[in-house]
UniProtKB/Swiss-Prot annotation:
EC code(s) of this entry: 2.7.1.35
GO CC annotations, alphabetized: cytosol
Cited function: B6-vitamer kinase involved in the salvage pathway of pyridoxal 5'-phosphate (PLP). Catalyzes the phosphorylation of pyridoxine (PN), pyridoxal (PL), and pyridoxamine (PM), forming their respective 5'-phosphorylated esters, i.e. PNP, PLP and PMP.
Cofactor note: Can use both zinc and magnesium that is complexed with ATP. However, magnesium seems to be the preferred metal used under physiological conditions.
Taxonomic classification: Bacteria, Pseudomonadati, Pseudomonadota, Gammaproteobacteria, Enterobacterales
Full protein name: Pyridoxine/pyridoxal/pyridoxamine kinase
Organism: Escherichia coli (strain K12)
Length: 283
């Protein structure tokens, strides 16, 4: 069999459960650099589509790289269909986006993809900023999220600051955060998981709030003092994995939070500045 024939036999195409669209670093454990191994640990196949390719996070004293050009980004997405690699696709997740134009390109691709995958789960982590840093993405990204990705998503995972930006509402207490999250729900957007919600500082707790049209569940976890980056990306990877493995939403959120805490403690024990996934035997 010739190599040309071999690589054009689409029945042999590698398939994935998840397409993960977000940042990638050469050194470190953020974006797809932590999400992909975490998803694979859960026994799921994943294709990683980079939005930015960086040497490392900008917290180090040297930093190189930038956003993937639109032509490349759209080509990465198109190639997955050209390779016929999406027959078994179950979910698409998004994290850090490099430009507003990438968000528009992704939304157009998702809209077309849904025609062949009407049950596709689209989970958006609207990475915009946080309370400590403010907005740390380009200023036109929040509106691009509102206009293009939120109307397509079944679930989103904003932190408190991002929830405020997306809704224009003050969310510094639990009731206001819940109200803001409910204001985003629609026929398409079924749930909002608010990370880093107000917790009990005295008891060293943080809260994650799971909001649907019918219920609100508040999950408390121990607060770990750390500057580790990528914990949100890991949380989303664990969450989507749990959902695809059949866990109910609140249970999947709870388990994802516990796994993040486990990874953070393991990383601290190994005195690393970058997240380290424990082997499955220790998970």
């Amino acid at each position: 069999m010739s190599s040309l024939l071999l690589f054009n036999d689409k029945s042999r195409a590698l398939q994935a459960d998840i397409v993960a669209v977000q940042s990638q670093v050469v050194y470190g454990s953020v974006g797809n650099s932590i999400a992909v191994p975490a998803i694979k640990q859960n026994g799921l196949n994943v294709f990683a589509v980079p939005t930015v390719l960086l040497s490392n996070t900008p917290h180090y004293d040297t930093f190189y790289g930038g956003a993937i050009p639109d032509e490349w980004f759209s080509g990465y997405l198109r190639a997955l269909q050209e390779r016929d690699a999406l027959r078994q696709l179950r979910a698409v997740t998004t994290g850090y986006m490099g430009t507003a134009s990438q968000i528009k390109i992704l939304a157009e691709w998702l809209t077309a993809l849904r025609k062949d995958h009407p049950d596709l789960l689209i989970m958006v982590d609207p990475v915009i900023g946080d309370i400590d840093s403010g907005i740390y993405v380009k200023p036109d990204l929040p509106e691009a999220y509102r206009q293009y990705l939120l109307p397509l998503a079944q679930g989103i995972t904003p932190n408190i600051f991002e929830l405020e930006i997306l809704t224009g509402k003050n969310c510094r207490d639990l009731d206001s955060a819940i109200a803001a999250a409910k204001s985003l729900l629609s026929d398409t957007l079924k749930w909002v998981v608010v990370t880093s919600a107000s917790g009990n500082e005295e008891n060293q707790e943080m809260q994650v709030v799971v909001v649907t049209a019918d219920s609100v569940n508040v999950i408390s976890h121990s607060r770990v003092k750390t500057d580790l980056k990528g914990t949100g990306d890991l949380f989303c990877a664990q969450l989507i994995s749990g959902l695809l493995k059949g866990k109910a939403l609140t249970d999947a959120v709870h388990r994802a939070g516990l796994r993040v805490l486990e990874v953070m403690r393991y990383t601290q024990q190994h005195e690393s500045d970058e997240l380290i996934l424990p082997p499955l035997a220790e998970a």
